[in-house]
């Protein structure tokens, strides 16, 4: 059986090449008719799970020194002007920090309100017990004999 040259170091038999040609032709025919199914699921980039599990960014270009620091500076030592992406990321971080502070203060305020309410409920319960009617024949009463 004659072997056909494919690429450096690889040779294919005629039956394999025939099979590949048939599959290629069928896929082209399917794409022309529009019956080919299209997947719409989200793609997971290579290594994304590994980076997320270790606490890194999902991609290497989200944040970090290579993304956040300027590529150059002036010869006299002045910093380079910030890029649009750097400005946008800085604004996003500031907005996130403001939201964290807002939610933290709301949480603290909610906790103080809850503690006040608990104290008021305890005081009210104590007041109810004090104002209850007492029985005349109390067991603590000592008799003089």
UniProtKB/Swiss-Prot annotation:
Transit peptide (residue range): 1-45
Biased composition (Basic and acidic residues): 117-132
Subcellular location: Mitochondrion
GO annotation, biological process: mitochondrial translation; translation
Annotated segments matching region Disordered: 60-86, 110-145
Swiss-Prot/TrEMBL keywords: Mitochondrion, Ribonucleoprotein, Ribosomal protein, Transit peptide
GO molecular function: structural constituent of ribosome
Ribosomal protein in keyword set: yes
Keyword Membrane: no
Pfam families in UniProt: MRPL52 (PF18699)
GO cellular component, one term: mitochondrial large ribosomal subunit
Subunit-structure text: Component of the mitochondrial ribosome large subunit (39S) which comprises a 16S rRNA and about 50 distinct proteins.
Similarity-based family: Belongs to the mitochondrion-specific ribosomal protein mL52 family.
Name assigned to this protein: Large ribosomal subunit protein mL52
Gene name tied to this protein: mrpl52
């Amino acid at each position: 059986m004659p072997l056909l040259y494919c690429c450096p170091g690889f040779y294919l038999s005629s039956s394999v090449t025939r099979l590949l040609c048939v599959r290629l032709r069928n896929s082209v025919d399917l794409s022309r008719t529009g019956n080919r199914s299209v997947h719409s699921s989200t793609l997971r980039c290579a290594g994304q799970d590994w980076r997320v599990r270790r606490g890194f960014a999902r991609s290497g270009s989200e944040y970090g020194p290579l993304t956040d620091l300027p590529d150059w500076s002036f010869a006299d030592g002045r910093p380079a002007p910030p890029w649009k992406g750097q400005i946008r990321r800085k604004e996003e971080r500031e907005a996130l920090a403001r939201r964290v502070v807002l939610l933290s203060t709301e949480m603290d305020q909610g906790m103080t309100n809850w503690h006040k309410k608990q104290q008021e409920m305890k005081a009210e319960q104590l007041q109810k017990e004090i104002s209850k009617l007492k029985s005349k024949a109390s067991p603590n009463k000592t008799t003089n004999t």
